[in-house]
A protein has these predicted regions:
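Core catalytic alpha/beta fold that binds nucleotide/phospho-ligands
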Residues: 1-206
Length: 206
């Protein structure tokens, strides 16, 4: 178990052994299983399952509990509610494309966002729509690939703050070659968050 108070776990769904899926499905609560069964797109279904499995593995590592001992309940339009253990850690889940991430903290409420950085998207038009002309003009003055990187960092920061749902005490950008990753917390963190990449093998969470 790490001494860091905030861990951000990241997986590429393409790297996860599908033989693990039945075990992950057995961890789902009744409300989670119902939602899981309603997904029609395989990618979205996989994002959901792996996100909940990774969250349970991460919480279990932090608390010294088996993943099956973590009970979550679905809430329409909101993050899942942690029912057991009743005094569990703060958490946030995010996904983009084949990538899924979760953050867990013993310190403060979290908001996490990840985005696949697509250099082919018209980030100037997206910035104009999302942030206004000033930001779009600022990006237009930048060379590539900095323009794309800065846009996605701003986008992730905005989404992470929205997920947090309150003023952020800190906002941290985590480096990754393919993704923009931003973690907001309700209070300043005692230590910087640590990013760990996993295939969701149980040995990764020892």
């Amino acid at each position: 178990m790490s001494c860091n108070s905030v861990l951000v776990w990241l997986t590429d769904a393409r790297s996860v052994d599908t033989a693990q899926f039945p075990r992950f499905e057995s961890w789902l609560s009744a409300t989670e299983a119902a939602r899981y069964g309603r997904f029609r797109r395989p990618l979205r279904q996989r994002q959901f399952l792996l996100g909940r499995a990774m969250l349970r593995l991460a919480m279990g590592q932090m608390l010294g509990l088996p993943p099956a001992g973590i009970t979550l309940e679905e809430r329409p339009g909101q993050a899942p509610l942690l029912l057991a253990p009743p005094a569990g850690p703060y958490f946030s889940i995010a996904h983009s494309g084949s990538w899924i991430a979760c953050a867990v903290s013993s310190e403060a409420a979290l908001g996490l966002d990840i985005e696949v950085c697509d250099p082919h998207r018209d980030v100037l038009a997206l910035a104009l729509q999302a942030f206004g002309a000033a930001v779009s003009d600022e990006l237009a003055a930048m060379p590539q690939p900095a323009r794309t990187a800065v846009f996605y960092q701003r986008w992730s920061a905005s989404e992470a703050a929205y997920k947090l749902g309150q003023d952020a005490g800190s906002s941290v950008t985590l480096a990754h070659p393919a993704l923009s990753i931003v973690l907001c917390s309700a209070a300043p963190l005692a230590q910087p968050p640590v990013l760990r990449v996993t295939t969701l093998a149980s040995g990764d969470f020892l």
